[in-house]
Amino acid sequence: GADRQTCVIHCAGIVSVASHPGDRIYRVNVGGTNNILRLCAKCGIGKLVYVSSVHAIPEKPEGTEITENAVFSPELVRGDYAKSKAIATALVFDAAKRGLNASVVFPSGIIGPGDSGKGSITNMLLAFLSGKLPVAVKGGYDFVDVRDVASGITACAEHGLPGHGYILSGHYASIRDILEAAKKTLNLRRAVSYLPICFAKVVAPIYERWSFKSEIPSLFRFWDDEMLACKRRDEVVLPEIVLSKIVRNSYDR
């Protein structure tokens, strides 16, 4: 059974970029985390690592670096996914204050092989490959290789301090960068028009309803025009991403 030698890594959850994902996202992301915390305390486990998300961290003005030292509240973030992760993160830190040896990691946009659940970036690449992505959004995000996230989680399990959080980031890539890398890596000829963020925000609700009915991935709400600059800690050092390699690995599943 579980004891002081046991390390629990809580990475289960629902990721959704939908504007209205429903109550299930709270039942799983918040309720599930609460259950894990209760069982960890009951069984006296030695270590808990909770896999949160950078979406749980409140945004700062453009050009300002975000850090793990933040107040986690659903009132300070946008979208149900971010709110659910912020609530769950606050629960974990509260448990750490009560004596649980718990640390939190905050991955940025995870990309790489083995995405059986087909996350947003994988869906975008698959849609692009099949010719179902006529338009995309200007802007981009900070992406991190899933294998580097796994290494970061392991490092946190071994060296993470109780009540501390660690951002697991890679580097910024624009949507254009990703699609151009896909074209070059996979020898594709695809034409894509790039919409300004301001226009994308206007048409996103309509596109989301249309994509749901036509089974085309809803992508607009995932992207932000602000660069996510993450502060890295010495305890969890991650290597740089080679974008073309990750694109290739995303297909070679």
Task: State what each model feature region is.
Residues 52, 90-113:
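Conserved beta-loop-beta element that borders a ligand/cofactor-binding pocket
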Residues 152-215, 244-253:
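Mid/C-terminal beta-alpha module of Rossmann-like enzyme folds, strongest
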Residues 136-138, 146, 197-235, 246:
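A hydrophobic C-terminal alpha-helical subdomain
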Residues 17, 54-64, 110-119:
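Conserved catalytic-site region of short-chain dehydrogenase/reductase
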Residues 73-76, 124-144, 148:
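A conserved pocket-lining segment of Rossmann-fold NAD(P)-dependent short-chain dehydrogenase/reductase
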Residues 22-23, 31-81:
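Conserved Rossmann-fold NAD(P)-dependent oxidoreductase catalytic core, especially the SDR/UDP-sugar
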Residues 1-31, 39:
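NAD(P)H-binding glycine-rich loop region in Rossmannoid oxidoreductase-like domains
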Residues 35, 87, 120, 137-157, ...:
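Substrate-positioning beta->alpha
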